[in-house]
Amino acid sequence: MKKFVALLLVLFVCLPVVAACSTLQGDNDKGATISMYLTDFPQTLDPAAVQLQADTAMIFSLIYQPLTTFDEKGKVKPGLAYEWYSYYDNRDEEYKMYFKLNETMWSDGISVSADDVVYAWKRILSPDSESPYASLLFPIKNARQVKSGIMTSDDLGLVAEDDKLLSITFEEDYDTGLFAEAVSCIALSPLREDIITRAIKNNTDNSREQDWDKNAAIMVCNGPFRVQGLEEGVKLSLERNQYYYRDDEEDKLDRSVIPFRLVCYYENEKIDKKDTAEATEQQFQADKFDAGKSFYLGSFDKTTFAKYASSVTTNKLLSTYTYYFNTKNDILKDAKVRQALSAALDRQAIVNAIGKNYIASTGFVPSGVFDTASGTDFRKAGGDIYSTTADTAKAASLLNEAGVKGGTLRLAYLVPVTKNVANGLTDTFGKISYELASQIAAESAKASWESLGFTIELVPVYAEEFQSTLSSGNFDIIGVDYAVNSTDAIAYLAPFATKYSGNKVSISLDAETYTPHYTGLSDEEYDTLLDEVIYLKDRTERATKLHAIETKLAELCPATAVFQYTTSYTYNEKILKKISSNYYGYNDFSDLRMADYIETNSRENEESLNEAKTRSTEDESEG
């Protein structure tokens, strides 16, 4: 009897603790729906694809989880993998590494397995794929030969030993700590082969809307959130992945993820058609934030950034805005001409004109990338390669040496929406505009280069045309978001080497074994420098060689970095907990909490219904 009473007492004491484990208020409560302006609408949610927008990584970090990650200070820590270790196979004389995976599930309830990682990485290394992240995987045995089509994916030193054990065989003895850091890149997250294969098979019309990476109904995610709604110009909705580190039968809904939904409405967006004022998307979003209808603001233009400057938090992103030069162009084929154009840029003036705390680039590899160890800075160790102000005297001298006095060049830049959406916004409202950092940079570059005697034609390229413009080389100069998101300098430098570009490779017998970078650069000396470092284990020697490679890249100048991206945000007082970020600058919203969310969400639902009725009445009267 005493034992029974004692057990009841223990249960009674534990009940409040169990209840406290959940933030939900009642059986029907799923959690807060938090309206926010996370970032601009993403043009692809394929983590391994060429990213058109650097800030898309902020969304990737919410819906995908790679094997490892970093804490705020840059120390590698577990992600999907909870443990990793090295092993020397004496029998086969091979260097191996193993990752043990956590038990978690995709957003459709299927367990995340080592096979999903194998598929994602083999997909990046496929000759049919176009991914700038391939070089991060080249330490794996036969990876380069697989990418070139010389070997098949079956020859790759990558195996799922079982559902939760991933085995990697290296080409040579390699620093497993360095590789553990490399695979924290969000681009190396696992993907589901069955989902992607079925989507490709069913998309017989090659419809952009039916691509798996642009369709919420098709996508599955292994991160804390899943994509619940994805409609360009209208909304992005992320919903709790109820299977993320959670037993669906035993655990509370909010065991691993507190908020139910994060919703960004782009259409305001339900503008009063009688309003004649013009404004940018960011200004509309700021107005919503000020009115208490949005609780997190994560994207700004110059005006709105200045408005909230005293309250924003800013983190570096390991991405840059970069100009690619077409080295096959008659004017640009001489490296001295490309160097001159780089020297003439006033990077600080461009950053000031954009006005969002971006950082003028002083080298091709951005600040925050590791040098000899985690926590050391490659950019600081390497010093300045670029001037942040225009050096017109140097530019003029280089052009004189090259014997070039001018000419006409087309400078392309991204408009980060599809043409139909852009036209639809203009036709419907006539008042929404975009303040584009890419356009501001282009206008500044145009002025700088025309002062040297060139004629510069600005060419806006819409989102659906941008990748084909890059791949075809149909540009003279093009501005790109070089969204590498890696702490390894080799990831920024390798794609310019012929064998490391990550571009598609034809496997026909009469085709070239490798496809050069989009810039068309092909330089044997540069290729040799990369060959010498790709398998190098000693991090000090490796860093020295990588600095030499960056110097060589500046000499060849197929590309030049203009500024380093940052991400800034502010949030409403209803957000109860400080938002945490990791070393990459990605925010963690899995523990985001909002005061009075039931009352707030109820009010929002009522307002939404009233707005819908009003619009319906207006449409009927207009009809």
Regions found by a protein language model. Name each.
Residues Y358-E401, P416-L425, G430-S438:
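Structural transition elements
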